[in-house]
Amino acid sequence: MARKILVESKVKAPPVDLLQILTAHGIGYEEVDDFPDTVDALIVEDGPKVYAAVNAKQHLHRRRFSLAHELGHYFMHRQGMPEEDITIDNPPSDEPAAPTKSPAETEADIFAGELLVPLEMLKPHVQKGIPELSRLFLVSEQVISIAISRHMKALYK
């Protein structure tokens, strides 16, 4: 699914331009300064209009991953969006955090990694170190490490 979105959005080189993807799919975007620290990102559908918002106080890498994660929910789980057509990751709550992620959350994380560090873009640069790849793709070193691990066979054959 992530590859399809990249092709449809005509994104061909790192760092993946998330604004280009949003624009290609008619999704508005805003960075919000007054989100609670516990809210990373959200997507809202208001009739035919769709808006994505991220917590502006987060690090650039976190904002990018959170937005890509929300896009994963939007593109993969849209029919079952809870909360009156709003999806919020890490919503404010007095409840303790769940010990494990739901399958939908895991899928959205995988989608985000595939969208931000696609194999086709990683392959030509894999000889670079993890810190350099992190800077190139504008993602955390953890996201790069996971991408390399997931694509180990394809990268080193």
Language-model region placement:
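Active-site hotspot residues in diverse enzymes, especially metal/ion-binding acidic/histidine motifs
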Residues: M1-K157
